[in-house]
Amino acid sequence: LKMANYDPLTGLPNRDLFYTTLQMGLTQAALRDWQLAVVTIGLNDFKNINLTWGHLMGDKVLAEFSQRLSNCLNVSDTLGRMDGDELALILMIRKGQAGPRQMVDRIREVLRDPFKLHGHDTPMTASYGIALYPDDGAEAHRLIKHANTAMGLAKQAGKDTYRFYTAQMNVEVMARQELETALRDAVRKQAFEVYYQPKIGLADGRICGVEALLRWHRPGHAAVSPAVFVPLLESLGLISRVGQWVIDRVCSQIAQWQRSGLGSLQVAVNVSAQQICEGDLVNDIERSLKAHQLDPHLLEVELTEGSLMENTPHTVSSLLTLRDIGVKISIDDFGTGY
């Protein structure tokens, strides 16, 4: 019976038992005129832990995270594991008792102690979504759905953030789903553009290089900012595919400039951490250079300092390989916290 109702890794109630407990809690809250809160909790960057350190270490982090949360709960509260790195919490709030905001602040505080990963202190944060009974719903499935909606928007707002559910969020979620659909269609049709921004030397005022900038004009809408669609490409797992297209398009453009007698301009291409970790960046670049018969020194790979710190061994290995074949490497946002 315990195996059927409890998660074997964390020892917490599983999804089915959590739903049953929530239904009972809602009945009790209605009878006693209490407030009830459902809080969904998602670890940020948990996928990177699995990619960098392996799933066994990821399981260890999740188990310790669950234990830390359990230690700061009241007797009447229930913590369960819903799926993957997502936990959920039932808070029974009696009159005069501290509300969900205070509990989330306590959880955030216990997370501030870093986790030990192979001897390294690794900070972790989570995102939280909060739905309240009776304001946001009276059924278990509706409260969990609304808490998940709020958590999704908390993740978009930044790490270590929480959001209370509001009806307006449904409009925002619908808009995001429409944006995702349009973006998937753009990837399928390769409906992006690459703009080229010249780099001007201060000493002589001459063009000393070019930076490639990815742009997307969504049909029927204003141009979408890269600050919006690039993170969305990453969350949809499409950034490597688009990044490969950009690299090939840039190499094609460099070759065209050479044929037109414009000389040999070095072009910088921005690369995301996910493109390095999950894609095949080195082979993508080598293939495009060969296809367009380009000297590798005409291509510059630019990544942020934060990207460099994700999955560091693989990232460094890829960058060293690119450097060895002649591709220039540059770091953007240097000195921003690492």
Short names for language-model regions:
Residues 1-5, 9-37, 44-74, 80-89, ...:
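Conserved long alpha-helical elements within nucleotide-processing catalytic cores of c-di-GMP signaling
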Residues 21, 175-232, 270, 331:
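Active-site core of bacterial EAL-family cyclic-dinucleotide phosphodiesterase domains
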Residues 28, 71-76, 109-121, 153, ...:
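Short catalytic/binding micro-motifs of nucleotide second-messenger systems
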Residues 51, 90-95, 112, 133-134, ...:
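Residue-level recognition of strand-loop junctions within catalytic nucleotide-signaling folds
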Residues 220, 241, 245-271, 283, ...:
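Helix C-cap/alpha-to-beta connector motif
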